[in-house]
Amino acid sequence: FIIYIATYGFYYLQIKLKSKFNRNIQYGVVGIFLIFVIYKMIIFHPYQNLYFGTLFKNNIHNKFEIDYWGLSANKFLNDVIVLEKNKYPIKIGVASFLTLERSIKILNKEDREKIVIVGQEYQNADYIYTAFISEVDINGNDKYKIPSNFTKIDEFILDGIRIYEVFKRTQ
């Protein structure tokens, strides 16, 4: 539907701006926008679902889900497997509503067997992953509060947008 409206808009502008000079300006503007979109898509690959998040003010990211599909969780799991290549099992707590089950299915069988998801049982976790997605008000509910015996060791920021953070047990 948006493509239809955009096409109609260009058609209308073309009728109104019949001179060749104005048409070249129109093609130039479209070309600039296409270059911008292509550039952003290359930067965000494979996280293209985050593309429109850059169009809003920085504080808007704190109010909405950023990585709803959990694509970044696959990156996190691969990083942890490389970091803890000799450890079995690697116990991961999740401090967000986003489940890691879909991301685990993407891993190969050998890596899948190394990972154990312990959910919010943080006392059993080696690492805690948070994607800042919550079904509860985090200001009044401590369900996803990171315990004090965990220290932030990594965060994934893409074009200024904080996607996830990783905490490791310090004891």
Where are these regions (language model features)?
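Aromatic/acidic, Gly/Pro-rich catalytic loop(s) in extracytoplasmic/lumenal soluble domains
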Residues: 111-119, 123-171
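Short extracytoplasmic/periplasmic juxtamembrane "stem" segments immediately C-terminal to an N-terminal membrane anchor
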Residues: 53-68
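Short, solvent-exposed loop/turn and secondary-structure capping segments
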Residues: 7, 106, 140-141
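Short periplasmic/luminal acceptor-recognition loop of GT-C membrane glycosyltransferases, typified by
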Residues: 66-107
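Signature aromatic-anchored transmembrane alpha helix within multi-pass, membrane-resident enzymes
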Residues: 10-52
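Short beta-strand segments
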Residues: 39, 91-96, 129-131
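Membrane-embedded alpha-helical segments of multi-pass membrane proteins
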Residues: 1-5
